[in-house]
């Protein structure tokens, strides 16, 4: 019987079974790896980050950003910069010192995989105001914000998501960037925001924060 089966095992059939087995092993290993980083990221986030950034990365605390749904590379880069002291975040001083690059990557991937409920983040902020939203949308278009942050403002790679982010955090951050006081942040933003007054930045922040919220 085995000899008969062997005779039927043509090179093409052998290649097919090898390929199918290889694909099966690949997906199995991928699933294991995904489960590993997801578990590790969640385990790291709960004791260290949840108190301020929310259990699933959606902040309800004034001036604290939501991390859910941010691009993985952006989160990863910011975590490294904070750990290395290249970006100043007083509340996080020393918190990341003992985390390895692999730990930070796991955190970044986990937060990037979470869903940002913009309504939750916006709940304690200013209620949506149509006039300010329109003004902010106009400012965003004139400043070409969608060129880097994407037309949806969901961010990409090293560029952060603006859609649904906390309004107060966005406003404070843009003021710091405009005034050249955002140490460790993208210097391009300083020139982009230069010349905008506080009211214009408030409208921009209001507009971005309401994207994705229910009417």
What are the roles of these predicted feature ranges?
Residues 42, 57-87, 93-99, 137, ...:
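Gly/Gly-Pro-rich "capping" loops immediately C-terminal to redox-active cysteine motifs
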Residues 6-7, 142, 149-152, 213-214:
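Generic preference for hydrophobic/aromatic residues in regular secondary structure cores
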Residues 36-56, 119, 123-151, 166:
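Sequence/structural segment immediately N-terminal to covalent heme-attachment motifs in c-type
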Residues 1-38, 55, 72-133, 173-183, ...:
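Post-cleavage N-terminal segment of exported redox proteins
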């Amino acid at each position: 019987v085995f000899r008969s089966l062997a005779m039927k095992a043509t090179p093409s059939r052998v290649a097919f079974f090898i390929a199918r087995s290889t694909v099966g092993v690949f997906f199995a290993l991928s699933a294991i790896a995904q489960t590993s980083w997801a578990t590790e990221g969640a385990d790291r986030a709960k004791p260290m980050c949840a108190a301020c950034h929310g259990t699933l990365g959606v902040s309800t605390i004034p001036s604290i950003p939501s991390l859910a749904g941010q691009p993985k590379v952006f989160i990863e880069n910011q975590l490294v910069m904070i750990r290395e002291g290249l970006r100043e975040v007083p509340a996080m001083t020393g918190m990341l010192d003992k985390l390895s690059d692999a730990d930070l990557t796991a955190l970044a991937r986990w937060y990037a995989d979470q869903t940002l409920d913009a309504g939750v983040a916006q709940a304690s902020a200013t209620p949506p105001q149509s006039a300010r939203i329109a003004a902010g949308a106009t400012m965003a278009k004139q400043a070409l914000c969608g060129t880097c942050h994407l037309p949806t403002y969901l961010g990409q790679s090293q560029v952060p998501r603006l859609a649904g982010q906390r309004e107060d955090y966005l406003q404070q951050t843009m003021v710091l960037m405009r005034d050249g006081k955002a140490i460790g942040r993208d210097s391009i933003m300083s020139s982009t925001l230069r010349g905008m007054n506080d009211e214009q930045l408030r409208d921009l922040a209001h507009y971005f924060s309401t994207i994705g919220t229910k009417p």
